[in-house]
Curated annotation (Swiss-Prot):
Function recorded in the entry: Catalyzes the formation of tuberculosinyl diphosphate from geranylgeranyl diphosphate (GGPP). It could also react with (14R/S)-14,15-oxidoGGPP to generate 3alpha- and 3beta-hydroxytuberculosinyl diphosphate.
Organism of provenance: Mycobacterium tuberculosis (strain ATCC 25618 / H37Rv)
Disulfide bond entries: none
Protein name, as recorded: Type B diterpene cyclase
Outcome reported for the amino acid change (mutating residue 293 to N): Loss of cyclase activity
CDD domains, sorted: ISOPREN_C2_like (cd00688)
Catalyzed chemical reaction(s): geranylgeranyl diphosphate = tuberculosinyl diphosphate
Temperature remarks: Optimum temperature is 30 degrees Celsius.
Activity-pH dependence: Optimum pH is 7.5. Enzyme activity is not detected at pH values above 9.0.
Control of this protein's activity: Strongly inhibited by 15-aza-dihydrogeranylgeraniol and 5-isopropyl-N,N,N,2-tetramethyl-4-(piperidine-1-carbonyloxy)benzenaminium chloride (Amo-1618). Inhibited by GGPP concentrations higher than 50 uM.
UniProt entry keywords in alphabetical sequence: Isomerase, Lyase, Magnesium, Metal-binding
Subunit and interaction comment: Monomer.
EC number(s) stated in the UniProt entry for this protein: 5.5.1.16
């Protein structure tokens, strides 16, 4: 297993986000502009078609991920020359698409409350394009009927403004399709690196339909595809995200922040985050981002404060709403994990448990619990262990009764081999690491002895700590942040050693 030193060096590159079939399919459509890029992406897609003919994450199954990925891949494969060259993949894909949209489909169906990022905006556009290409979508009207209301609600949030790089909808700019470019502020979409909101799929759409052949967008995409294996990640670059989450995981362990050697090791990474922190606004995924978010800002505030820096809490407070904190402006539904991380930032800032802001966040979290069990699911991560474990770390001292109940749920769901997994089937190293972090934190905080459970989990994790890791994180489709997951695992293994001492 790597060390935190080597992990942070990787995090600083910001390229730890896994490739997705959805984003890669958009790059594969660029054949008319760049044959080499298109062919590399197409090869990646065809090598990763699932046994049932669909595309997306094999585990865990997510209907929205599988539908968007398969639609995007099939649109790419049936465009121009690809259909003849990849006839076998097309035939299997057609069957998979029929099965996914059939009323007889066996498995989780569309749940708009549990959808991937921008699904209600993107899916109707892709389905319309698929129809133009002659791809049959069963029950199309039924699926679109569930999406239309949420799509309209989200677009109303824009208040008539055109989509530009300062609005979150830019991340899903392909929602405009071939005929909706009028929705876009065309000259104010690109970031300094040529991308549209650091999204390969949005950038490919831009190069195809907004500014055809745009050299800056194509250069951004080429830099990713040529440096990898032909796949395109869910987003790139994301070094602030990867650094602050790696440091947050490190901070769960018993490190001596007064040790000059430790300070020197982490100095350049803390400096990088602090240099890009904008007073009153915070940070986004990457240092050059034009859009800050409450989640990254809250975690960065927590980390910078713990390591002796002085960020301003006002950057977190700007996201405060009447009943919760928003991740982004124009957000339709709140994120539980973002509010959990706000709670951690408020604690680090010295807010008392009786402060109205703390009480507001706690009330929102209490009201958002999964029915019938003491756990929480969120729109940024598929597993309830992520949000629940982070809640225990953030809410201790604020609401110990809530934390105790959440600890009970974690203990009751530990598998006989010591691992955890929220979904039927396999347990994962990532989820097991989060649970170890929560148990170790609660053991230190409450004095409750949990060494046996932690040790059992550590034994399993030490045998299952290497990649590949399941894509449990949520963007337009599911992805994995390998650097962040490795940091969580390394943190958990350290905590196991500390618990045994």
């Amino acid at each position: 297993m790597e060390t935190f030193r080597t992990l942070l060096a990787k995090a600083a590159l910001g390229n730890g986000i896994s490739s997705t079939a959805y984003d890669t399919a958009w790059v594969a459509k660029l054949g008319q502009l760049d044959d080499e890029l298109s062919d590399l992406a197409l090869n990646w897609l065809c090598e990763r078609q699932l046994p049932d003919g669909s595309w997306g994450a094999e585990f865990p199954f997510c209907y929205e991920d599988r539908l968007l990925s398969t639609l995007a891949a099939m649109i790419s494969l049936t465009s121009n020359k690809h259909r003849r060259r990849r006839a076998a993949q097309v035939e299997k894909g057609l069957l998979a698409l029929k099965n996914l949209t059939s009323g007889a489909f066996e498995g989780p169906q569309l749940d708009i409350k549990d959808a991937t990022v921008g699904f209600e905006l993107i899916a109707p556009t892709l389905m319309a394009e698929a129809a133009r290409l002659g791809l049959a979508i069963c029950h199309e009207e039924s699926i679109l009927g569930e999406l239309v209301g949420v799509r309209e609600q989200k677009l109303r949030k824009l208040g008539g403004s055109k989509i530009n790089k300062h609005i979150t909808a830019a991340f899903s700019v392909e929602l405009a399709g071939q005929d909706g470019v009028g929705m876009l502020d065309v000259d104010n979409l690109q970031e300094t690196n040529g991308s549209v909101k650091y999204s390969p799929s949005a950038s490919a759409y831009f190069a195809l339909h907004v500014k055809p052949g745009d050299k800056r967008a194509l250069a951004y995409i080429s830099s990713i595809i040529q440096a990898g294996d032909g796949g395109a990640p869910a987003f790139y670059q994301a070094e602030i995200f990867e650094i602050v989450w790696s440091l947050w995981n490190l901070s769960r362990t018993d490190i001596d922040l007064s040790d000059p050697e430790i300070v020197r090791t982490y100095l350049p990474y803390l400096d990088h985050v602090e240099q890009h922190w904008v007073r009153g606004r915070g940070v986004g995924w990457t240092g050059n981002s034009t859009l800050e978010d409450c989640d990254t800002t809250s975690v960065a505030y927590d980390v910078l404060s713990k390591f002796g820096r002085s960020p301003d809490i006002g950057a977190v407070l700007q996201f405060e709403d009447a009943d919760w904190f928003r991740t982004y402006f124009h957000e339709v539904g709140p994120s539980i994990s973002t509010n959990v991380h706000v709670l951690g930032a408020l604690k680090q800032a010295g807010y008392d448990k009786c402060h109205p802001r703390v009480r507001k966040v706690l009330e929102f979290i209490r009201s958002s619990k999964e029915p019938g069990r003491f756990c929480w699911r969120d729109k940024w991560h598929r597993s309830a262990y992520y949000t629940t474990a982070h809640l225990i770390c953030a809410a201790s001292n604020y609401d110990d009764a809530l934390c105790s109940d959440a600890i009970g749920w974690i203990l009751n769901t530990q598998r006989p081999d010591g691992s955890w997994g929220f979904f039927d089937g396999q347990a994962t190293a990532e989820e097991t690491a989060y649970c170890i972090q929560a148990l170790a934190h609660w053991q230190r905080h409450s004095g409750t002895s949990l060494s046996a459970q932690i040790s059992r989990a550590g034994g399993w994790l030490s045998q299952h700590c290497e990649p590949p890791y399941a894509p449990l994180w949520i963007a337009k489709t599911l992805y994995c942040s390998a650097t962040v997951v490795k940091a969580a695992i390394l943190s958990a293994l350290r905590l196991v050693d500390e618990s045994n001492q």
